[in-house]
Every structure is written in structure tokens, then in C-alpha cells.
Amino acid sequence: MKATGIVRRVDDLGRIVIPKEIRRTLKIREGDPLEIYTEKDGGVIFRKYSPMGDLQDFAAQICESIGANTGHVAAVSDRDCIIALSGAPKRELLDKPNSQALEKLMESRKNYRYTPGGTRLRATEGSDKYHLGVAAPILCQGDLMGCVMLLLGENDPALAEADQRLAQTVAGFLGKQMES
């Protein structure tokens, strides 16, 4: 682990201020949950917590089912990266950071469907091979948790409204699973 050389004091309420540079680098937003671990030698470790991580295996099974039934690449992301994928090589997309366009789309909490001639939104940073066909935000008690996506290749035709409804249904289901 690399030391950053920043020292912070704990205030009367037990709070520690994490510097803006570190929050920006690690993409820690206001209100994001952090896990706190302690080491035997007295060290304290803070790690970003992804509630979607608890559903990673389940999301992978759903992606396999959607991918098999639609013939398209199916993916589920949390707010930071793709956590489940089916229909594409995992090394290309899995655990890759979400693109800024996808983050902006998720923040709007709106469903998305690509239309021919429209702007192609990439799912991940640095990958031009796939773009969003449909996307539906995963909401849990009003909080944004991630996104369900069907991805298209360069020459794939646009997806139908039924595919968009499928993504919406799966996103709603995953949101309900997180509530329980």
C-alpha cells in the first residue's frame, strides 16, 4: 500500500476528513458508503463499499439468461464499473470503469434506448467496441445503485422496445432484491 503522507485528526464526533484529491482520485462521492477494516498491527483500512457487490453472482446469472434470450451482450454495473457480463469477453468489459456518458445517464435516472443515427454512448472508458443499446437504472429506495444494459457492436441493429422493457424489469427486480 502506498502512503500518501497526509495526516488527519479525528474530531470530537469521531469523524475524519478525507481530502478532496483522494476522494476525486478514488471517485468517492458524498454519501458513498465506506467499509472500515482493522489490521492486527493497528492499521485502519477504508474501502469503498458497493451494495451491488453482494448481488454480483446473482447479476451474472441474470446477464447469462438475458444474453441467451436476446442474443445481445448483457451487463450490470454498479456506480463505478461493470460487475456482471455475458455475451462478450470478460477481459474487455468486466471491472472496467463506467464511461462518463454512462455515469451521466445513470445520474439522470432515466431509461435509455439507442436510435439509429443518434450518438453512441460507450459503456466503459477506453472501449469503443461496444455501445449502449438500452440501459435502465437500478434504484433501491430511491437511491441509484447501478444500471442494467444491453450492449451493441458496431454493426448491430438498434434494439426493440421489448428489449428496453426487459432491462427495466431486471433493473426493478435487482432494486427490490437489494431492499430485502
Per-segment meaning from a language model:
Residues 1, 28, 65-68, 126-130:
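Short loop/turn motifs at secondary-structure junctions and domain boundaries
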Residues 56-65, 98, 102-103, 149-180:
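Juxtadomain coupling helices with adjacent low-complexity linkers
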Residues 85, 146-147:
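Short glycine-/small-residue motifs
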Residues 132-139:
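A short, aliphatic-rich beta-strand micro-motif
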